Amino acid sequence: MNKVCGLDVHKDSVFACILDEQGKIFFEKRYGTLTPELTKLRDDLVEKGCGRVAMESTSIYWMPIWHVLESDFELTLANPYFIKQLPGRKSDVKDAQWIAECLQKDLIKSSFVVDGVLRQMRQYSRQHRRLTKNLVRLEQQLDNQLQRCNIRFSNYVSNQGSNVSLRKIIKALIAGERDPTKLCALVHGRTQNKHGKQTITDSLDGVIEQVDIQMLIQCMDQIDLIEKQQASCFTHLEELAKEHFAEEISLLCTIPGINKLSAMFILAETGNDMSAFQTANFLVGWIGFRPRNDESAGKIHSRKTLHGNKYLRQIIVEITWSAARSQKSFLGKKYNDLAKRMKSKKALIAIARKILVIIYNVLKTKQPFDHKKNMQAVVDGEEIIEVDTINNIFKIDGEDVMAERRMNLGI
């Protein structure tokens, strides 16, 4: 066995422990986390003949160390939860030494770490979603400010953030307009016809003070700034995706519920190389959609899903809501069928798992998803027969790449 190194990563320090071929401590040292110190760490590991290095995924502090070492060593990123669960550790063993021992005995399963372009795409995609959350918060704050002034127009429109009429009204209020009749003229005719012109006019008759105007100005300035930042993230993300993953995006867009933006988000999290996951079930487990196996003496105690990649989980759930509403796809029909005999959110997770398996096979086979082969055939207008072709849509040289489908209901 070659020499191995375990790194105990902290915010301001890194503890390194190198073990020799016999498992004895060969070298120990504490380093800082500034770039010159990390460079010294790399040089020392090279000088000592270390081949493999392992560290725990401590917050974001492991990332700079990974960037410095990745070109010279075989790196392993370990989940701290799994390291702590391994038996045999003595109380006096240091963290770095224990990590090195586990690495030397091949007891550590490496976490999935993206590199290069995907690393950049991840930052853009996650920032885009953070900005979306901030935007929703500001839109709610804006609505609260209008409600304080007894401007109740938001009660009669949906999707307040992107409502053009509401934006026009706010800009008019900031400009000094107070006449509810003139404000009502800015409202789309469809909204006036639906709720009545007088009702809309009355909803715009409020009591506004100067402090309210200042709060509206600040909210609108922040919203405009976030929208510009969001557009910038989307532009950079689109450029990277178009240059490196144009084919994969077009393939993913053939799946019900997935558009260009969600396809880019998915690729930023999973990448386009599915060899990182042995089967679709490994990808399902990585995201946390695989039910926990909590069964004893034939009695199932829990089927709660596990923890996983929260970013991809949110994206897949949003996609699933979109696909579940469609009655023109196999997924929408399957959701309605499952929702009749279980809670709607449980049915949603079941469909989300199906979509994740489809995504895995689309990226693995480089073949578009043909939802027509999965549609349910209606016979005589009453009896619904599910066309069971989902199992043989994806074949590689005659071998079924979806054998794990039979482990669960459906896909």
Predicted regions and their residues:
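A detector of single, family-specific signature residues
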Residues: 1-411
